[in-house]
Amino acid sequence: MILKQTFEQVIEECRVRIATDDTGIPRERPIPLNSIESHAVVISGIRRCGKSTLLAQLYRKLDESALFINFEHPLLLDFTVSDYGRLDNVIAQHGAKWLLLDEIQILPQWEVYVRQKLDQHYKIVITGSNASLLSRELGTHLTGRHIPMELFPFSYNEFLKLKSLTESPETFRSYLFSGGFPEYLKTGDTRQLAALFQDILYRDIIVRYGIKEVASLQRLATFLMQNVGNKFSAPNIKQAISVNATNTILNWCKYLENSYLFSFVEKHSYSVRSQMISPKKVYAADTGLAYALSTHAMTDEGHLLENLVYIALRNHHSQILYFDGDGECDFVILENGIPIQLFQVCSELNPDNLQREVDGLEEAMRAFSIPYGKIITENQDDTFHSEAGTIDVVPFWKWKI
């Protein structure tokens, strides 16, 4: 049981912290408030990517018309369903119109409570760090009553703004290896990234799903982090991580994806079975995290760039596949299931790889009847014309998605 005064203490601590702390730079993607009269805005993303800060920025704008409650506060760890009544009383006493509910998905039956508050005409913005919990519970009780928003670590432009830098090959390379986690960008202490990695594994996966084979899960996560941009299949990595059951690996990969630590991109195929059994490509949530947890001498810079391009595309597109025919195209962007854009990634085009990169992209252009494509590089500009169409070569730091 949680006392009313405990809720008041948590609310006051949140208010004071937001009033005194640096709430950082504005994000490129604002919270979609235009539909908030009847819908809850649900901000999801990996831990420490800036969800709470984004909520704090909104709180500052709203001032006294809002309540900010951090449900991961230690004083609220024993929250039960019976505590909702006292929480309601506290909210009513404050006369708030906006409820900013940070990490509310850890509460029992939270989605029922949010639905009730929507029916009472509160404007609600919530955050969460687990895609599975959010999607399952939102689909049950908040179907048609929520606006989803995914938040990622800082983009290149946000990185530049935070650091007061300008676009250049040098600042791009700095971003490539440091990534976009806000706290790490302020300190440069790689121990923060290692601690974040372990925190996600423990809190979002091991504890939440009751994983017993902790060492094997650690090996899987480390293996994936060190192989971003590569294809993999569960049967082929069983021996490397000392796990016998393919289904166990598949389940763990789903948990890792639900925590936003990794994304898995499937091969484009018009056959559902072919798509399911084909190897997937793995990408980390952040290139700085991947670099910090890899053996630097063995880091493939091209794969790191490919990972960065994937993150940039995911900021704008939800349907992303790869193409694999006689050649390969790294990214096929779809809209309503229809391929609309094609991207190839190559750190540096040279006589040894140029034909392979162009051939793979042109094959995809012909396959999908798309007369244009892009090759994203570190620092090369060019344009190629062929019977398949036009290919623009663009450095990442000049690329405007």
Residue ranges and their predicted role:
Residues 67-95:
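Short glycine-rich substrate-engagement loop in P-loop NTPases that contacts/grips substrate
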Residues 79, 105-114, 136-137:
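Conserved ATPase-coupling elements of RecA-like P-loop NTPase cores
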Residues 92-110:
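Conserved P-loop NTPase "ATPase switch" module shared by AAA+ and STAND
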Residues 2-18, 152-311, 315-325:
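Interdomain hinge/linker elements that couple catalytic modules in large macromolecular machines
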Residues 123-129, 150:
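Structural recognition of the conserved hydrophobic beta-strand(s) that form the central parallel beta-sheet
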Residues 95-98, 120-125:
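Loop/turn-to-beta-strand initiation segments
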Residues 132-147:
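Short regulatory helix/loop adjacent to the ATP-binding pocket of P-loop NTPases
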Residues 2-23, 34-44, 48, 53, ...:
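A cross-kingdom feature that marks ATP-driven nucleic-acid transaction machinery
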